[in-house]
Amino acid sequence: MQNILVVEDDYDQNQAICYSLKKSGYGVYGVTFMEKGKQTFIENQIDLILLDVNLPDGEGFSFCQWVKKQREVPVIYLTARDMEEDALAGYESGAEDYVTKPFSMKILLRKIDVILKRTASANHRIFTDEN
């Protein structure tokens, strides 16, 4: 089972996203603070992160940069910040995608599926090439 970390400070939205992900067969960790997200990331095998930009204890951009220094894990931003410079900052921080709210859960689930399949395929090629 692939595990997704949801870092979203709006509790109701966090719960709704987590519910949809669980229903789609993913293992899910939902947190509302960046520091709790870091702790959860360190303690668990996380395969993808859904990340808000505006968090009570910091900006998602710095969290994404921190994650990328730990190991390569795909990050998708989910945010109300729809300015071009925010999206560019999101990609520059290392994210695979930048999705603005409101969003379609069906489309988000498809994006997650595509990214996880691409990541698994790349990891398989690396493993095969090394042996």
Question: What do these predicted regions represent?
Answer:
Residues 1-119:
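N-terminal/domain-start alpha-helical segments
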